[in-house]
């Protein structure tokens, strides 16, 4: 591992531990040349997932893009950045565990909405409005009515 301070390639590992719920290894290293200490992370290389956009265009799944959209929808809702990271982590893990290497953007949107539904109604509606391309107030109303119907069904079961 190359030292970020002097670019020497010889270092020793001082400490190793599991990180990110066991999905990576965090290593504390010391450069043998300048004694600078730095941290590295070792992760399993994920097989790329291809996202099929609405227009048929294909692109590699971009975790940052999804996290950014989720962050925008969840502004001022009380959901913490770590919770949003957890949502994206869970979604990415389920995509990696899937037998398919392709997924539509619609399927990703529905997966995100299923996570948001139980966490924040406001974030759910905001994300749905962008993802489902709401064009009028009636689109918002029908989504809210659907959420209320789901609540009524749950209340009837209890």
Curated annotation (Swiss-Prot):
Molecular-function GO terms, alphabetical: ATP binding; DNA binding; zinc ion binding
One Gene Ontology term from the biological process aspect of the record: negative regulation of DNA-templated transcription
Keyword match Zinc-finger: yes
Annotated InterPro entries: ATP-cone_dom, NrdR-like_N, RNR_NrdR-like
Listed cofactors: Zn(2+)
Cofactor note: Binds 1 zinc ion.
unnamed zinc finger span: 3-34
Pfam families assigned to the protein according to its UniProt record, in alphabetical order: ATP-cone, Zn_ribbon_NrdR
Entry keywords, A to Z: ATP-binding, DNA-binding, Metal-binding, Nucleotide-binding, Repressor, Transcription, Transcription regulation, Zinc, Zinc-finger
Domain of life: Bacteria
Domain ATP-cone: 49-139
Annotated function: Negatively regulates transcription of bacterial ribonucleotide reductase nrd genes and operons by binding to NrdR-boxes.
Similarity comment: family membership: Belongs to the NrdR family.
Protein name in UniProt: Transcriptional repressor NrdR
